[in-house]
């Protein structure tokens, strides 16, 4: 058995206590021949900070890029950055060009890189694309692109928000192949103009959001499992025709409970793991598509407290995915309003209280969700 032994003195900790019990030594044995988790990527998302940071002076941009992406050390041996292995890039839907008519707040509007004529416009999303290039320059090996909404010229309400609609995909019923062509052209444009290869594409972000993407917060659309499957099949066909090796990631769920059952939505946007990856789900099974990763993706919101619940749902999801031969990826996390333990997500908090809270969620995702 290969082991590593770490001996840590407890004197520093004990000195801060009212009554020290003397010098004690703790010994930890790490069994490196018995791995418990496999970490494929450690990444972060660009939405929406990089639309601003990407316009800063070049020296400041490079400093931020080093913090995020660098695996180098300075002369003193101190790491320059955290060495992310994946960068998650948002392909915009065009709410920025609509301005106030978009019904979306300015900070989360995005430009659209592919116009109604089907051509890639290299003048669009330049700030966000700058960080794609900076990531590649620093050796980030993988790029995941995702969409919150189809482009506004393909949606039913001609908006990138779902306001005024129900719980179905905001896409014209005859525009599925056009949407797949849009995504494919965006991927090809990033390769041509920025020398950036998109390894993974997530065509529908959080389609099960129980709020149905209503209101001014951001771009977004719901989608039923049947609609998700139809989008995936059309995109798989388009990627194949274009000769692209990009893999499709589904379903980027907003709530892990929607992957395993019905939660605050109807049956059409529930049980997503079985719907998309069980061969018994003949209408919605996407496992035969050449480009589809055998992966179910979700976001670590709404299931983080209490601790027992956080642990149990991740174990249930891990086991259910294994039975179907599918891996689980956690692809998004930030502080939300339900995180009452640390103040509900408003404002800024650089204290260890918030840091430890986030670390606990990451720990549970890795250890129990694998």
Positions of the model-derived regions?
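Bacterial N-terminal signal peptides that target proteins for export
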Residues: 1-9
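Bacterial N-terminal signal peptides
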Residues: 8-16
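Glycine-rich tight-turn/loop motif centered on a GG-T
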Residues: 169-170, 217-223
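Function-critical acidic carboxylates
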Residues: 204
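Catalytic metal-binding/acid-base residues of hydrolase active sites
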Residues: 207-208, 254, 297, 301-302, ...
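Short catalytic-loop micro-motif centered on adjacent basic/acidic residues
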Residues: 249, 295-299, 305
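Catalytic-core region of carbohydrate-active enzymes that cleave or remodel glycosidic bonds
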Residues: 300-370
